[in-house]
Amino acid sequence: MTDLTTSDSLQPAWQTRDHLDDPVIGELSNRFGPEAFVVQATRTGMPVVWVKREQLLEVMSFLRKQPKPYVMLFDLHGVDERLRTHRQGLPDADFSVFYHLLSIERNRDIMLKVALSEKDLHVSTATKIFPNANWYERETWEMFGITFDGHPHLTRIMMPQSWEGHPLRKDYPARATEFDPYVLTKQKEDLEMESLTFKPEDWGMKRGTENEDFMFLNLGPNHPSSHGAFRIVLQLDGEEIIDCVPDVGYHHRGAEKMGERQSWHSYIPYTDRIEYLGGCVNEMPYVLAVEKLAGIVVPDRVNTIRVMLSELFRINSHLLYISTFIQDVGAMTPVFFAFTDRQKVYDVIEAITGFRMHPAWFRIGGVAHDLPRGWERLLRDFLDWMPKRLDSYVKAALQNSILKGRSVGVAAYNAKEALEWGVTGAGLRATGVEFDVRKWRPYSGYENFDFEVPVGNNGDCYDRVMLKVEELRQSLRILEQCYKNMPEGPFKADHPLTTPPPKERTLQHIETLITHFLQVSWGPVMPANESFQMIEATKGINSYYLTSDGSTMSYRTRIRTPSYAHLQQIPSVIRGSLVSDLIVYLGSIDFVMSDVDR
């Protein structure tokens, strides 16, 4: 579902559209009247509708209950509009909150926006319509100071409870050098430690019943089964989990704030570190979103190279996930086999990009350089090696009766629950929903590849891990097609906003030299607009929503990651289960905390 036009590859590919022809605009107009909202033209590929604050919940409920409903709150966050200069035709706003809704049946999205005055930063909570709004509203309050009236627990989520200020406001410093030196006194240390003490009453929990007390157990933030700096406070009756509270933010780096201080090109290395196992997969949505802003169409060779690198990193990530899941259940050996196989993936990646985990290799309009001589042999060796190894993982470990006994039927949820909590990727497909962005909304030429989308039926831990095995096989299938059908042609687009121009042209045309000088000094200037790109990342759907104000840097960079939604779902799934089941459930989610905390 894109606005890509291919009739003339020399013209800008991404047109600014208002999507007034989208059926949902007619449905909203018939129900609320055309005067009730303002439609914004963007390059996001979806209708963007400003609604009145008083009607927001009514509009969301209406869309939620349509015959083809918008069943998922995909994203929710805010924007500080005070310094934005290109706002012609939009409602007056000091701040805005956006709600990105997704419909599976329509395969369409819509973005609702609400304008807010700095003197009245209040909007009603959406948690009664979409339960996963909880964490998103907490983060939006924390970062912008926007209060969501009626929210069950509006507290900080990324920053320490003692933090002062709202970091994503434009008047909040972006550099550490703009702050006074931090001094940790004994008094401060005591206050910080006190703030980490869990108080059950704050979360509506009881300390016990008439007959016995509950135990409150900290799992993490340094427990090996929490897979990173992640803390879950468990309310236990013996081994049974009565309730739990996930505690995130220990890995927060301010990635979205960094996007406001880096040029469009220099931000690419930061994207690698959002989900540090994904490598080039993380670069894909960012560069595609910037290319929409710039109106760049990349050559077919670039598309295929990007797909090839993305699938190599997908295999690399899935191998680690499968082996650590097996380790969480109690088997050690497969982890060592997996690292042998992952090294073979890295051999190919390093030969092509020059780096391993964080190559920062994709460029706006292309890739850093062409494929090296001999890449075919390296890829061929890996494609000949991996299928048999994958079979051995299944036979030796995943078909083991003990592993199946620990994971079949454990931490199961259905499609309705998955959509309510914003679950994407294998976690959603394990419930029977065949939603894979590579198939449903192809990008970077995925529509030219022949592959299947594995789906499950039970939505349990075992289904989730077996889906990843099948996804590995499909990634190998895609790589085989890259090997056999790599197009000829340039590795970058011939566009003034992309990679440096050919040297011979700079020696003939002074205008080209001036453009090149500006690009490498200040950085490229992107047209004022908004763009959006989602991709099928290693752990679910990852997306970038970019706002340009006609500058060398992004005005607002919103990064939606899959792991954030997946961890928010934990309490609803694990209540009533045992602690041992929680360990298996955490291992089946496939998350890293950099992807959660950004």
From Swiss-Prot:
Source organism of this protein record: Yersinia pestis
Keyword vocabulary terms for this entry: Cell inner membrane, Cell membrane, Membrane, Multifunctional enzyme, NAD, Quinone, Translocase, Transport, Ubiquinone
Gene3D superfamilies cross-referenced by the UniProt entry: Cytochrome-c3 Hydrogenase, chain B (1.10.645.10), NADH:ubiquinone oxidoreductase, 30kDa subunit (3.30.460.80)
Pfam families: Complex1_30kDa (PF00329), Complex1_49kDa (PF00346)
Protein family (similarity comment): In the N-terminal section; belongs to the complex I 30 kDa subunit family. In the C-terminal section; belongs to the complex I 49 kDa subunit family.
Keyword presence, Cell membrane: yes
Subcellular location field: Cell inner membrane
EC number: 7.1.1.-
Protein name: NADH-quinone oxidoreductase subunit C/D
Subunit and partners: NDH-1 is composed of 13 different subunits. Subunits NuoB, CD, E, F, and G constitute the peripheral sector of the complex.
Membrane protein topology class: Peripheral membrane protein
Record field: catalytic activity: a quinone + NADH + 5 H(+)(in) = a quinol + NAD(+) + 4 H(+)(out)
Region (NADH dehydrogenase I subunit D): 213-598
Segments for region (NADH dehydrogenase I subunit C): 1-189
Principal place of residence: membrane
